[in-house]
Amino acid sequence: MIAVIHSFDSLILGGGAAGLMCAIEAGKRGRRVAVLERADRLGKKILISGGGRCNFTNIHCQPENFLSANPHFAKSALARYTPGDFIALVEKHRIPYHEKTLGQLFCDGSAREILQMLEQECSSAGVSVFLNTKINEVSRSPEFAVHTANAEFHAPALVVATGGLSIPKIGATSFGYDLARQFGLKIRDPGPGLVPVVLDEEDRSRYCDLAGVSADVIASCNGQQFREKMLITHRGLSGPAILQISSYWKKPHAIRIDIAPDKRLTSIFRDPKTPRTLAVLRSEFRKTLPLRLADRWLDLHVLASWTNSALEDLEHQVHAWAIAPAGTEGYEKAEVTAGGVVTDELSAKTMESRKVPGLFFIGEVVDVTGQLGGYNFQWAWASGAAAGRAM
């Protein structure tokens, strides 16, 4: 059987957030663009994001909100496609939205509205979309040729927007990294990011029967700290504070957790008239911490004496609880993939490979990982726009 040959100006592999934005920008410039998506529909990760409401950007987005071996790489793209630019697009389509917390913007309704907006913009820009398209091979001589079971797609520009390894149940694979290596680009070892951590057997026995208990904490590791909610799970720790710090944590290091920020739980004992008893101490802990966590903490951290020094040691432990996770919940529970195509291989302005003209990498496949709260979508929009405007 002779394969059907399709010719375009630009081929975009992956119909997620970055790929669709790239297609829109390139199509608006008159380029003949094709998006090749292996799934049966576009934007599956968009649809499940933000609890189904899509945390589509963060109004406080800065380069400092991203983790990369080169912290300066993201600056150019983020400056040229800002949260305000995406908000303008959302407002153009009259999609109601709200700020939830810390600058995080969500749809009032459904994430489906964001996907429909992107699909409409693609249609207006003349973008061709091919679903259920499994790629067998990619070659270059001198144009790029993408081979599928029954067709070939040719173009002078190829954009890899295939995402990372997180959430394999919706189709995540190593395809983008494999393709980068095929063309001689280096990869920074990928790993799960924004992911719950798993405790070792000893710590699980101490804390995990408290699954469902949450508290406002400060989680710190590797020079970073985040003040948000922590959630105890059946296997370890989760919640925004833990997801945030997980991207900066590496085994065997510890994560330090302040379980009572801005509080001194033993300060009541400065008054010499206060009885130094467990009942008084437990009452103070319960005023700040969830009851079950307060009681468990005191059961596990028994005072050897009621001296000022012993109370100070207990206070220190409250504000510097050191947990050395056994690992993470892996890509199945990770919101993003850290690591990826080394940024030194790419132009910060266009996302084009320095070694292979016409080859672009955008979105999660690149070694740029945003913090929790809409930053990874903003990187998808910004890197996609940068490549789309360069082709």
Which residues fall in each region the model found?
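Core beta-strand elements of the Rossmann-like FAD/NAD(P) dinucleotide-binding domain
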Residues: 6-8, 149-157, 225-227
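N-terminal Rossmann-like FAD-binding beta1-loop-alpha1 element of flavoenzymes
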Residues: 8-35, 387-391
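Short hydrophobic core segments
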Residues: 11-13, 36, 135, 153-169, ...
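Glycine-rich FAD pyrophosphate-binding loop
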Residues: 27-51
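An anion/pyrophosphate-binding glycine-rich loop and adjacent beta-alpha core
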Residues: 40-42, 47-48, 56-63, 96, ...
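Glycine-rich active-site loop/strand segments that organize a redox cofactor
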Residues: 51-101
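Feature captures the FAD/FMN-dependent oxidoreductase FAD-binding
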Residues: 80-157
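A glycine-rich dinucleotide-binding beta-alpha-beta segment and adjacent secondary-structure elements
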Residues: 130-131, 295-369
